[in-house]
Structures are given as structure tokens and as C-alpha cells.
Regions:
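N-terminal glycine-rich phosphate-binding loop and ensuing alpha1 helix
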Residues: 3-51
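Short beta-strand segments
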Residues: 9, 98-99, 128
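Short, structured coil segments at secondary-structure junctions
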Residues: 43, 67-68, 167
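Short phosphate-binding loop-to-helix
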Residues: 53-116
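Conserved core of the sugar-phosphate nucleotidyltransferase
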Residues: 58, 105-184
């Protein structure tokens, strides 16, 4: 298997809770806590913040440098394009993706997503049974490329529909032990 990278999608443009990614818990930014959790994994070749070219996101690049991880700057609104270009830039074959405001994600599930990919070769692997704030996705670079070719919008902040509504991708939601599942 080629390189596996964790792409953290992050921007500073939140309006409901401004600058939420740099709010501190115990003197550490929320995004730094997430990075710490990702560093606990043995399966990742890269951890990358995928942010925008907007100057307000400079602080995220500074945090990436301080935390000794990489960053990529791309489109502000086209999240799929940003993910694809970041993965291509760092020569990733497989991507684990999470939004930066999910600092409590469990590294146990990183391994589960990758194991499922190795078994199923699914284009997208989801963890929808986990509580909100713990979701992560597994994506093949080749599937991202296909979405770039077929998408009809440049605002792809919500991009899952390209995988689930087109009927051209193999999508798998992994089994989550009952004790970790959310109650709807």
C-alpha cells in the first residue's frame, strides 16, 4: 500500500464560534490537541493541515510548523479540490480525513478505517455510527480525482453527496462496537 496521510481540513472563518480552532483548553489550542491524538497512530506516513490561502489561516500554518507537521494551502470553498491537491502534493495514495474541530477522535478507529480499506478497497469509508465530533473518513486518491471530474459546484464544504448520490463509488460505513455508537 502507498503512503497514508491524515488530512485535517481547517479554516478560521467560523462565525458561530470565531477562531474556535485556536481556542485553548489547558493552554493548548483545540487543533493542537487533535494533532497530538493523530500522532499516536502508527499507521500514518503524514499528518497535514489542509487549509486555505486566506491570510486569516496563516495561524494554522504556524501551528503546523510548531507541531512539526505539514500543511497545504488551497481553495477556500472547494474542500474536495483542496483535499485532492494536498493529497497529490504529498503523494498520498490513501487519505484519512477529519475536520479540525474534532479533537476527541480515537486513533483506534484510524486503524479500523485502514483495515477496512485493505479488505474492501472501498472508495470512501465512513464512521457515521460514531457520535458527532468523532467522525473520520477514509478516501482513495483516485476516487477524489473522479469527484473533481464530475462535481458541479465549487463550494464543496459538504462533499459526501458526490460519493453517496452518484452510485459510481464503493462506499462502506464500518461497523462500530455498540458501546461507541451514537444514540439518535
Amino acid at each position: 500500500m502507498g503512503k497514508i496521510g491524515f488530512l485535517i481540513t481547517a479554516r478560521m472563518k467560523s462565525t458561530r464560534l470565531p477562531k474556535k480552532l485556536t481556542l485553548k483548553i489547558m493552554n493548548r489550542e483545540i487543533i493542537a490537541w487533535l494533532i497530538d491524538r493523530l500522532k499516536q497512530s502508527d499507521i500514518l506516513d503524514e499528518i497535514i493541515i489542509a487549509t486555505s490561502t486566506n491570510p486569516q489561516d496563516d495561524i494554522l500554518c504556524n501551528i503546523a510548523e510548531r507541531e512539526n507537521i505539514k500543511f497545504y494551502r488551497g481553495s477556500e470553498d472547494d474542500v474536495i479540490e483542496r483535499l485532492y491537491q494536498a493529497a497529490k502534493h504529498f503523494e498520498l495514495e490513501y487519505i484519512l480525513q477529519i475536520t479540525a474541530d474534532c479533537p476527541l477522535v480515537s486513533f483506534d478507529f484510524f486503524d479500523k478505517v485502514v483495515e477496512n480499506y485493505k479488505e474492501t478497497k472501498a472508495d470512501l469509508i465512513t464512521t457515521f455510527k460514531l457520535p458527532h465530533g468523532f467522525f473520520l473518513y477514509g478516501l482513495k486518491l483516485s476516487a477524489l480525482k473522479k469527484v473533481i471530474e464530475i462535481k458541479d459546484d465549487s463550494d464543496t464544504e459538504v462533499w459526501g453527496r458526490y460519493f453517496t448520490e452518484t452510485n459510481i463509488f464503493k462506499v462502506k460505513d464500518i461497523d462500530i462496537p455498540k458501546k461507541f455508537q451514537r444514540n439518535n
